[in-house]
Amino acid sequence: MTEHCDLAVVRRVPSSFFEALRMDEPEHAIDVAKAKEQHDRYVQTLKGILPTVLEVAADEACPDCMFIEDTAVVIGATAVITQPGAPSRRPETRPVRDVLSGLGLTIVDMSAVNPDALTDGGDVLFTGRELFVGLSKRTNAAGLEVLKSTFEVLGVPVYGVSVIEGLHLKSVVTFADTDVLVVANNRSVAGDCPSQKLPPM
């Protein structure tokens, strides 16, 4: 099973971005103007390679809203609207739900399936065949179970992975190519994973 992407949904950087959640206090304050400029270039790049890019307006009441991947997990014609682990981020989901519903996708509201389920999309990695879900500070076992019950009936295996360090699974793992995951060389992710250490580039 492979997924061909021809559409992206993005969300603009709010001017309140300097109030975004963080694990540690940064050495320097966020340069919001620069962040907006960089995000604009990112959006223009997407528009150069994809037929359709949908933009959701920023919400000044939601400083983290530009991290739109945390609000939904989409595979094929099915979208799970997540319940983000940080309560302050939960209002971000409604506008994203509206956009995805308008595309005709089947919508599954995680909070309606299980009010205790929590998931940030940053903990969800889809390889085109299977779904890896990080169990982290922001994603719990109940959230994993909602994803399993939604996507495994569609033929997508779903696996939970404990995230020991870092905020999200995709902070320490990324999908590089068919059958290749790049994993941080530390104890961030629990479990035995067949791997090959590559020399520094």
Q: What kind of feature is each model-predicted range?
A:
Residues 1-201:
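The feature marks the mature, well-folded catalytic cores of soluble enzymes
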